[in-house]
């Protein structure tokens, strides 16, 4: 479904999870997914609808799964993982009447997610196992004894953690989140040769063992009000270092998420809000 061939009017739902906002399309009837140009047009906040990412809900791919979805960044590039998006897909299915149970499965591009409704407009999604092996993040290089990667950025030395939550993340711990160099360091890390597929960059400040503050510079979107996989990445990196406990509240500019990782060999769970903002029709 490209810009020239898109069927107008195009019905959509605007959704948000902790301020991370999405244009959601129902493509379960077999309508082709949007191409990169159409995604960028829809995501444009001046000439389109406006969002951080576009989500297409598609027929399920496996037994026992209620639906599958694909997700694209605002620049039209494909995304593999999105915790806030997964919760919004779950909320969309519940609102649509497609799901009548509190616990169900949905397919993302990289895995099947177990989702639970835990309250009004609140969902918990199982995000899978974090991956720390550098070649699987992917990341060239090896961590030091503290689990940090030491990188050179235009003459500066930067230490960061790294993990894949289905997509690559770098985690930079800072003293004061409000003055963190997000707009400067974020693009530099994304363009660094150590990250062959680029990277999402999380800047995190530890408040206490159960609370952190976070800002995320996302691939293909820039800084967003919230990033669910970024919250998981920051939390598990800090847990590995013993900086926080296994159940952490993550405060982002758009709201608060909860990350739980009870055991190192088990899956990470992300909890937080997912809400419908409005239904609309796009005329192109």
UniProtKB/Swiss-Prot annotation:
Residues binding substrate, per UniProt: 20, 53, 73, 83-84, 167, 200, 218-219, 228-229
Principal subcellular localization: cytoplasm
Enzyme Commission code(s) on record: 5.1.1.7
Active site: 82 (proton donor), 227 (proton acceptor)
Ribosomal protein is among the record's keywords: no
Xref: PROSITE patterns: DAP_EPIMERASE
InterPro entries in the record: DAP_epimerase_AS (IPR018510), DAP_epimerase_DapF (IPR001653)
GO biological process, one term: lysine biosynthetic process via diaminopimelate
Known pathway: Amino-acid biosynthesis; L-lysine biosynthesis via DAP pathway; DL-2,6-diaminopimelate from LL-2,6-diaminopimelate: step 1/1
Catalysed reactions listed for this entry: (2S,6S)-2,6-diaminopimelate = meso-2,6-diaminopimelate
Assigned GO CC terms: cytosol
Family per record: Belongs to the diaminopimelate epimerase family.
General function of this protein: Catalyzes the stereoinversion of LL-2,6-diaminopimelate (L,L-DAP) to meso-diaminopimelate (meso-DAP), a precursor of L-lysine and an essential component of the bacterial peptidoglycan.
Protein name: Diaminopimelate epimerase
Gene that encodes it: dapF
